[in-house]
Regions:
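Bacterial N-terminal signal peptides that target proteins for export
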Residues: 2-15
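Bacterial N-terminal signal peptides
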Residues: 14-26
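N-terminal low-complexity, Pro/Thr/Ser-rich intrinsically disordered segments
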Residues: 34-58
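Acidic/histidine-rich, surface-exposed loop or edge segments in extracytoplasmic proteins
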Residues: 36-42, 87-90, 123-126
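Short, solvent-exposed segments of well-ordered alpha helices
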Residues: 45-49, 75-79, 132
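Short N-proximal segments of mature Sec-exported proteins
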Residues: 52-112
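Compact alpha-helical subdomains of small soluble proteins
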Residues: 93-162
Length: 162
């Protein structure tokens, strides 16, 4: 007796996003120039195990809807009790890496995930604007972090770094 596996639209979309984001670095790296600056919103820094730890920590920081600040202004006070997507990633970056990195790999990968799932919205500040978008839910924020974590894990495996 064989079982039929059905693929829902959501599953198909998730597979497409992961596939695109795993292959995208190879095409982007072939097209980037050595003069790309750290201020470039599409810069793609190399991924390390630290980036995976940063995204996992950001998920811990934002582990409940009560901790989510959906009114981000990209100012992240140390004493904050609620956190936007951007501030959770920045706080995790500072805790784990020792300093904030606005264009660090973990934040950049999260930006690229937002590009894929909300590319038609053309956000000026992807992390802030996606966080503040009235159609964005806490589950959506968690999904961005989950996909980002999965992509970084896949890319590390591809580099032979587990």
């Amino acid at each position: 007796m064989t079982k039929r596996i059905t693929v829902t639209g959501v599953t198909r979309r998730l597979v497409c996003i992961i596939f695109t984001l795993v292959l995208l670095p190879f095409t982007v790296n072939a097209q980037t120039t050595p003069t790309q600056s750290a201020g470039d919103s599409n810069v793609r820094p190399p991924i390390t195990k630290v980036d995976l730890q940063i995204v996992k920590r950001a998920r811990e920081i934002l582990d409940s809807p009560a901790k989510w600040n959906r009114a981000d202004n990209r100012v992240c006070p140390a004493e904050a009790k609620t956190f936007s997507l951007y501030c959770a990633l920045q706080m995790a970056t500072t805790e784990i890496g020792g300093k904030a990195e606005h264009r660090g790999a973990a934040l950049q990968e999260a930006r690229f995930v937002i590009d894929e799932i909300a590319g038609d919205r053309n956000y000026e500040h992807r992390l802030m604007n996606y966080n503040n978008d009235q159609t964005t839910t806490f589950a959506d924020i968690q999904e961005v972090l989950r996909i980002t974590e999965s992509l970084i894990t896949l890319r590390l495996k591809g580099k032979g770094t587990h």
